[in-house]
Every structure is written in C-alpha cells, then in structure tokens.
Amino acid sequence: MSAIPRTSIIMPVYNTASTVIAAIKSVLAQTDPDFELLVMIDGSPDNSVQLIAEYLQQNPDERVRVFNNPKNQGLSAMRNQGLDEARGEWVTFPDSDDALYPIFLERLHYHAERTGAQVVNCAHNMVATDGSTTQRLKGAPGTLTGQEAAFALLKDELSPYAWDKIIRRELFEGVRYPQIERAEDECALLDCYLRAQSVTVIDEPLYAYAVSAGSLTWSRITPLSETRRLLEYFEKSLQRTSTYHLLAGQEALTIARVIAYLNNAQQALIVGGESAPAVLAGCRAGFTVSDALLALRIRPVFGAAGLLLKTSMPLYRLLYGAYVKRVYNL
C-alpha cells in the first residue's frame, strides 16, 4: 500500500457478526488494490470484535486498520473518527452488512477520471432476505454541478446514501456527520455537494445493499423534533452559501420539507403505537397546502402525497404506502 492510498474505505461495525467478514472480504477483493480499510467497531455487543481479529490473524493485510471503540457512540461518530484517521484522496462508507462488488472502486475511479467529478454515485442492487435482487438508481446518468446536485439531493432526485459513491476527501474539510437521528448521510452529503465543482452519476450497479427489517428507515418512528432538526440543518447549510437566496434553492428546501414530513408520517403508519396519532398530526401541520402544490409542480408524487396527507388519510395511507414499498423494496 502506498503512503497515501487512493481511497480510504470507512466501515462502521455494530452488531453485524453474521455479515461483517463477508463485507470485509468484498473490500479486499477489489480489483483496484490502492486503498486502506478502516474498520470502526462501535462498542458492538456481539462477537464481531473476535471474528474480525481471528479473520485478520489468518489473513493479514497491511491495508486494514481496526479501531475498537468499547463504548457505543453511533454511526456518525464512527464515520467522523474514520475521516479523522483517513489518509486517502477519496473516501467511501460501506455498511458492514452489505457488500461491494469487485469492480466498485475501479469503475467509480474510472468515471471520476473521465469526468473530473469530485463525487461519483453508482446504482446498487437491493438484496432481499430471499436472495432476490432489484436494481435501483436515483438520478439520471450524467454530470451535474455541485449546486445542481445539492438541489437534486434535497428534492430526492439523487441518492442520499454514503455507501454508493466515492467522495474526494478534501470536500470533508470542515464537514462531519451530524448527530441527528435521521438522514445524517444526506446532511453531510449536502455540505459536500455545496463545495463540489461537479458530481457524476453512473447507472452501473456496483454495491449490494441488504434489505432487512431491523436496518430500515421504516422500523421506527423518528421524533418530530428530529425531523425539525434535519430541516433546520438543510436550511443552515444553504444559508452558508449563495444558494439560499436563489429561487431554486428555496424550492428545493420546500420540497425537502414536504418529503421529510411525508416519510415521518409513513413511519408512524407502518410502526403504529401510542405515539403514532400525535406524529401524524404534527406531520400534517409541518407543511402548508402551498408547499404541497409547489411540490406537485416539481415532484408530482410527493406533491400529491402531501395533498392527500392534508385532506384524506385513508388515500394517503394507500397510495404513498404503495410508493414507499415499491421504492424501498419492502
């Protein structure tokens, strides 16, 4: 491994003993060998630590560094620690229950060199518990300016994930993952896009994302206070740049607000429980009919869902629920 590897691969580990070795193997099988793997153990209560130690003892690799944090600190803290330790020119953040296809790095770097982009997004395969796969790509293949990518991200037109892309590490100077209970990936990514010159999207599925009920956004109800914190983060990020005063920036923030409350409401419908009615009421009050009408013009699915949430809960439950199940392979 060179003193400065091309890519730092930062992999948080928490309670994934059944999958973490396969995830590590998928990294070590990359056709582009110029990387370092930072395994960030987050106070995992299972035997992940032992399994990783045994595997690396039997298969030593100088490219792998393990950071065993005895106390659980959360996903954002692990990624931030990894960024502090990273030496690579690029970074990526695979989950320890997923897998990179062997050409993940090779193909993403090829397109980075081809376009000069500072971020390259790829498609991914969603792998269901029965082994079936569904390919998913958010965004049309091509290259956007950083500003265009930031607005597209807020409008749910680009992938908000940390694991299906490579990012120039320099974009993280002064940027870290916030301690927010939802969409921390999207928060940091928004800040990176606002700093980037260009962002490329490719339609090659290079990542296998394991769909499991325990890891889904839809397995718990996010407190309304966290949704408000998320939206405040988006607004402050744009306020730090000239994009905040642009009409396109304000429209993107409005659509992000509608989407955030729609998803929060859908969580409440799926999970249920005593808190669900209050959360649903808060989500309905979180945006205006004018907001939903704006979304209807630019992002029709979300605009229509917003109007239904405001006016007809049964229809909202039926139609937006079907959309969520299709998009997230539930």
Model-based region annotation:
Residues 2, 75, 103, 116, ...:
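General helical secondary-structure elements
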Residues 269-330:
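Membrane-interface aromatic/basic loop that binds lipid-linked glycans or pyrophosphate carriers
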Residues 1-227, 308:
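Nucleotide-sugar donor-binding/catalytic module of glycosyltransferases
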